[in-house]
Amino acid sequence: MPDDPALASGNRPDPAIMRGVIPYLSLDGRASEAFDFYARAFGAREFGRFPDEENPDRLMHAQIEINGGCLMMTDCRAPWETEAPRPQGFNLQLVVTDGDAWWSRALAAGCTVVMPFERQFWGDRWDMLRDPFGIDWAIDEPAA
């Protein structure tokens, strides 16, 4: 799509973050809200929002960078999918050197505490937060 303004602006992700496993969240009707929330809570940088051609109020695809990694999301569901329950069985882990700053910013933006940010038996400071979309985030500050 050479005429796409998001691509024409040069607002493309660093190829280094486009490797490995990339989480892709389906947030039925809430992807734009999540996109903005992740900028406030986790300092996310935007690499593009692409509306659904049939329903321009919904995002077909959105892409951000958080802490050097890529996160993708959509408002759309495949026709065979039903509305998803709160995500379970995984979390998104942020490994950082300044855990207190990440923790404070996420709480101020609206995350709730699942586990407090404390020193763990393996030596790291670690926590678990839940964002308003039901996604659990762990902040890990490795022991020095």
Functional labels for PLM-detected ranges:
Residues 1-19, 51, 60, 65, ...:
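Vicinal oxygen chelate
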Residues 15-17, 25-71:
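Core segments of cupin and vicinal oxygen chelate
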Residues 84-88:
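GST-like domain detector, emphasizing the conserved glutathione-binding G-site
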Residues 29, 76-77:
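Short beta-strand-to-loop junctions in surface cap/lid or active-site-entrance loops
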Residues 23-25, 90-94:
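A structural signal for short, well-ordered beta-strand segments
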